[in-house]
Amino acid sequence: MQVDLATILSGYAQGYFLMADEETGSLAWYGTGRHAVIPLDERFHCPRSLRPLVRSGRFQVRLNCAFEQVVEGCAARPQTWISPELKQIYAALHRSGFAHSFETWQGETLAGGILGIALGAAFIGESMFYRIPNGSKVALVKLVEHLRERGFRLFDAQLMNPHLARFGAFLMDGQEYLKLLQQCLGIPCRFN
């Protein structure tokens, strides 16, 4: 399959994201009136019950060591929007330095991870998964720390859910989101 990276990146730069229909697998661009945003400032909240685990060192963090495994982990659900075609797009974005996996490990076992796309100072979280309980939660906390350290200004989680709300995620109005996204595109940040 030939992937047109310029078109894919342009879509994300305009606030859209790709999803495959769970039944047919056909890809389409989606946009929401409001985006779920995970704050990278003092509004981010690490649940009190999770703090000892984050500090314990039980999970180690790695970047881009198991990208394909993270994509497969994110797709391994009874109903998934990550089709084989979308997996190929993520792989092409990864080879080009745009798509990344942020992973938690226990020894040599992949515990969980987050799949996302970095564009300037924006990180667009596509999906997350865990194999060991709390693996994805610790990954989320550590990813926020990582993004802060590297000067990222936006962590777009796309769609709100109760899990993200526990960490302080909030819905940002579409126009405000697009304004912030455009600012972020002009700020060079390195994910690695």
From Swiss-Prot:
Q: What HAMAP family does UniProt report for this protein, alphabetically?
A: Leu_Phe_trans
Name the family. Belongs to the L/F-transferase family.
Q: Does the keyword Acyltransferase apply?
A: yes
Q: Which UniProt keywords apply?
A: Acyltransferase, Cytoplasm, Transferase
InterPro entries, from UniProt? Acyl_CoA_acyltransferase, Leu/Phe-tRNA_Trfase, Leu/Phe-tRNA_Trfase_C
Q: What does this protein do?
A: Functions in the N-end rule pathway of protein degradation where it conjugates Leu, Phe and, less efficiently, Met from aminoacyl-tRNAs to the N-termini of proteins containing an N-terminal arginine or lysine.
Q: Name one GO biological process term.
A: protein catabolic process
Gene symbol? Answer: aat
- Name one molecular function that GO assigns to this entry: leucyl-tRNA--protein transferase activity
Gene3D superfamilies reported for this sequence: Leucyl/phenylalanyl-tRNA-protein transferase, C-terminal domain (3.40.630.70)
Q: Which reaction does it catalyse?
A: N-terminal L-lysyl-[protein] + L-leucyl-tRNA(Leu) = N-terminal L-leucyl-L-lysyl-[protein] + tRNA(Leu) + H(+); N-terminal L-arginyl-[protein] + L-leucyl-tRNA(Leu) = N-terminal L-leucyl-L-arginyl-[protein] + tRNA(Leu) + H(+); L-phenylalanyl-tRNA(Phe) + an N-terminal L-alpha-aminoacyl-[protein] = an N-terminal L-phenylalanyl-L-alpha-aminoacyl-[protein] + tRNA(Phe)
Identify this protein by name.
Answer: Leucyl/phenylalanyl-tRNA--protein transferase
GO cellular component, as recorded: cytoplasm
One Pfam family, short name please?
Leu_Phe_trans
Q: What class of enzyme is it?
A: transferase
Give the location in the cell.
Cytoplasm
| E.C. number(s) listed in UniProt | 2.3.2.6
Transmembrane region positions? none
